[in-house]
Amino acid sequence: ADTGVDCLGYLPSMEGIKLPPKHSVISVANRHSLNEQADLIAEQLEKTVDINRLLSRCNRNFPCPYTLPYTSDMEDDSPVLPIRKIKIAVARDPAFNFTYRENLARLAKWGNITYFSPLYGYELPEADLIYLPGGYPELFARQLHRRHKMMEALKKYAERGGKILAEGGGMVFLGRSLKSKENGTAYSMSNILPIDFIVPAMPKLQSGYRKTVGEDMELKGYEFRYTTIQQDDTLITNRRSMITNLKGSEELMPFYRYKNVLASHIHWYWGDKDLIKLWE
């Protein structure tokens, strides 16, 4: 009451609730456990949180009219419109699924979205722009390594000047190789960026809010990764952009650019940015 902020409820400590680490929630066993715990937490929230008041304070209208899969009929209030509709291919499967809903809505405004799976698919869709979002490719390194046809098509697309935007795990898939453990097998990836990635024996989480300053726009995003660069044989970085944390201190990580391929460790939030300018 002293702060002038209404308390809409609380979640008490619950016996038996133990959420798995973020890095392991993608496994089948942990997903099953997580779903069961989510149901228990939901039941508790109904008892201790004023749900109706909470929803009344939200900016969005509920129930939300959009459900997965998101398609190109999503509306966006942004005034920036493309000159023409473009074909956009978005990777989406258990290895690549870290996307912001607003980013998908933004892409849907720019063009017609086709989803594809680097993990299970063989064909790369015809596209003017390919978006490889983040994920945990290190958990599927062997399976991805076997998708030779997919990786060859992706490399040919990049070499002939195709536009690719890769974030986090998406950038790892563009690399030369990936070791899911320090003394393990180096599985070959798409070899678009001459970079070797590895998950160290003692994985250290690199995380935090980031922004890039330079070019004609400022982008903000979040870094969350366990992989590190074991070897980087490239100078194909976009030196005009500097990545900093929110305090303004420079982060020692590059924003890679090779031909029309843009890649970084950051999961960017695009907002109403004119993304096409990234390739101008």
Specify the residue positions occupied by each region the protein language model found:
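Cysteine-nucleophile active-site neighborhood
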Residues: 136-212
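Short acidic, glycine/serine/threonine-rich loops at helix termini
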Residues: 19-26, 101-103, 142, 176-177, ...
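Phosphate-binding active sites in nucleotide-utilizing proteins
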Residues: 79-148, 152-159
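Short, solvent-exposed amphipathic alpha-helical segments in soluble enzyme
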Residues: 1-2, 103-109, 146, 182, ...
